[in-house]
Regions:
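Active-site gating loop/helix substructures
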Residues: 128-233
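Patatin-like phospholipase
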Residues: 7-9, 16-141, 145-149, 185-196, ...
């Protein structure tokens, strides 16, 4: 029988493509029966949290295991190191093209890789590669972002089911119109609000929602501590998954493309460190809640490829996350009622 441990919150910070560190750790928590009353999410943590809490047409465990399937088969990624399954082309014609593709008989069997063998996943990725290559685009020098706002979440989350959950859920986005952080609550969160929360500059144009423009919240508050502090003053235990403040993500670039990834992640790693430190000093030390941080340790040999969208990297990080989650529970399980 679970001991009474009070009100618990899980904080899922930004992180991509190393988000499978968090899905792996969450699987360890799910298997151990750990439940939370509150979920506070930012950036890639929103992908992890929403797909876990309200998975579309699969169980929570299946959804967590399926997270690795949004990477690209290595045989393709080694030749074309872009995740065309996550980042899709912008424009009205591209939108119509995606809609037409989704109406093809057997479409879901091609894109849903849960339960596929490695060979089947390669064939799926190969078909999706040509779909992406043939997709029209209106990208130009006058575009405000490279990609259409996140489409992949449609395959992952049942937003109607999300609204029926008992847990309190918070997702952040930064409002450019008001120049302040916006906190979306469970009843508000739908496809549009999610896309607003993940609109990282350059990759995506600012997302217009109810006449206001938004960018990714994790670009300003890597963990959505603001949503937690403003709405949940009576927490007993706060667990933070820190997949962004990892110094091992920084390394000597392997090539110009890798250098591009490094210039994006470098300020985000610093932001993750600063946000967590600030939360400890300004909020946590003044209350009685127990703050537990799961720091992911990526082995040195895996660090150079830790920001790759290859299937092998996502699988490796998932395994690291799972082992990290198990180790965390061995040390802190009693504080979480397991």
């Amino acid at each position: 029988m679970e001991a009474h441990v009070g009100k618990k919150a899980l904080v899922l910070g930004g992180g991509a493509p190393d988000y499978t560190l968090m899905t792996g750790a969450l699987l360890a928590f799910e298997e151990a029966g750990v439940k939370f009353d509150v979920y506070s999410m930012a950036g890639g943590g929103g992908v992890v949290g929403l797909s876990y809490l309200a998975p579309l047409n699969m169980t929570r465990e299946e959804s967590l295991r399926n997270s690795v399937n949004f990477g690209v088969s290595d045989a393709i990624y080694n030749m074309f190191p872009i995740n065309y399954k996550i980042f899709t082309k912008p424009g009205p014609a591209a939108s119509l093209y995606r809609t037409a593709l989704s109406m093809i008989p057997g479409y879901s069997r091609i894109v849903n890789q849960l339960g596929m063998t490695p060979s089947e996943k390669f064939l799926s990725d190969y078909v999706q590669f040509w779909w992406a290559a043939l997709m029209p685009s209106n990208l130009s020098l006058f575009s405000e972002g490279f990609c259409a706002h996140a489409q992949f979440i449609k395959q992952m989350v049942d937003f109607d089911a999300l609204h029926k959950l008992d847990a309190d859920i918070y997702l952040n986005a930064y409002c450019l119109t008001d120049n302040k952080m916006a906190i979306f609550k469970k009843d508000q969160i739908d496809l549009a609000h999610f896309q607003a929360s993940l609109s990282y500059p350059f990759f995506y144009s600012p997302y217009e929602l109810n006449g206001k423009l938004y960018i990714e919240g994790a670009s300003r508050d890597a963990f959505n501590f603001k949503g937690l502090m403003e709405n949940e003053p009576d927490l007993d235990t706060i667990v933070v998954f820190d997949a962004i403040g990892i110094d091992g993500l920084l390394h000597e670039p392997r090539n110009l493309w890798d250098a591009f990834g490094q210039q994006i992640i470098t300020p985000l790693v610093a932001l993750g460190h600063a946000d967590l430190k600030l939360f400890r000093e300004l909020h946590h030390d003044k209350d009685k809640s127990d703050l537990l941080v799961l720091n992911f340790k990526i082995p040195p040999k895996l660090q150079p490829a830790a920001l790759d969208w290859s299937s092998s990297n996502l699988n490796r990080l998932f395994a690291v996350g799972y082992e990290s989650g198990q180790a965390f529970l061995e040390k802190n399980g009693s504080k979480l009622g397991v």
